[in-house]
Amino acid sequence: MTTYREAGVDVEAGYEAVKLMKNHVKRTFRPEVMTELGGFGGLFSLDKEKYEQPILVSGTDGVGTKLKIAFLTDKHDTVGIDCVAMCVNDIICSGAEPLFFLDYIAVGKNYPEKVAAIVKGVAEGCVMSGCSLIGGETAEMPGFYPVDEYDLAGFTVGIVDKKKIINGKTIKAGDKLIGLPSSGIHSNGYSLVRKLINPTENNLKEYVEKLGCTLGEELLKPTKIYVKTIMDIIGKYEIKGISHITGGGFIENIPRMIPDGLRAQIQKGSWPVLPIFDLLRDLGNMADKDIFNTFNMGIGMIMAVDAQKADEIISYLDSKGEKAYVIGSISEGEDGVDIC
């Protein structure tokens, strides 16, 4: 008689992984969570009295080929933060507060400790975002993924009052663009990074003076989560538009928040570019157009604000220990971005 285990699926390992991750998941629970881990669906009680016209906002994303760095370094407890960050940073561009999160992990072979380490990172990202990890799926797929590899994706739902939706419609010529620093490459552009660096177990262990850490440590720095900073600032100031600088860099993402007939002018040198981007530029002999169309260049989130409020907002953020820079402005013109 042929068993499921002989086909490559270890159900007992799945049970063990759930057991190991339970405490990580529970620490993310908000009071609105109505279910324990292991049910068929996650229940979340929505307090509609807090909103005049509650609008749900959803987002989904994955970590991409940054996972290859985790495989080579055998470090798996931070990529979950990346997964959460990529989702929640998207929905806060609409002004939405993240409520809950679900993850999907597909593995070639279920190693319970490894899966628990991944979920630990997801839980950490949820705590940083103030949202609850109310469900997920770990799929063991023998013959589909190599035994030491996996994929990781997530899904989040948030909420915003209809009158407080941030959609960029009020952005006008003369408005200023405020940039919030990134922690590093974040989770986009890693196919190019890997082509330029050709990562191996050995070179990822090498200390790079200009980075101040090993190459592996730099490439695995978790994506910065901006939820608490953005939720704080939109509660005190009018933020006209927000752009999460992900795949496509400045060139693709800034126009997503700007109305037709307006153009963004980005001033080079107005913020400190992280050393990793100088390294990548040199390795690939990349022109500005290409590198700004791929990487975040040290700015992970951009806000459009009234010009008269820009300095005040930056001072407020500074008082909270958050760096921010006026990195450009809005002008009339054909849709697009100028890197000046």
Curated annotation (Swiss-Prot):
- Pathway annotation: Purine metabolism; IMP biosynthesis via de novo pathway; 5-amino-1-(5-phospho-D-ribosyl)imidazole from N(2)-formyl-N(1)-(5-phospho-D-ribosyl)glycinamide: step 2/2
Q: Where in the cell is it found?
A: Cytoplasm
Which EC number applies?
6.3.3.1
Reaction(s) this enzyme catalyzes, per UniProt? 2-formamido-N(1)-(5-O-phospho-beta-D-ribosyl)acetamidine + ATP = 5-amino-1-(5-phospho-beta-D-ribosyl)imidazole + ADP + phosphate + H(+)
A single Gene Ontology CC annotation of this entry is: cytosol
According to its UniProt record, this protein's enzyme class is ligase
GO molecular function annotations of the record? ATP binding; phosphoribosylamine-glycine ligase activity; phosphoribosylformylglycinamidine cyclo-ligase activity
Q: Which GO terms describe its biological process?
A: 'de novo' IMP biosynthetic process; adenine biosynthetic process
Keyword annotations for this protein? Answer: ATP-binding, Cytoplasm, Ligase, Nucleotide-binding, Purine biosynthesis
Q: What is its main location?
A: cytoplasm
> What domain of life does the native source organism fall in?
Bacteria
Family indicated by similarity:
Belongs to the AIR synthase family.
The name this protein carries in UniProt is Phosphoribosylformylglycinamidine cyclo-ligase
**Organism name:** Ruminiclostridium cellulolyticum (strain ATCC 35319 / DSM 5812 / JCM 6584 / H10)
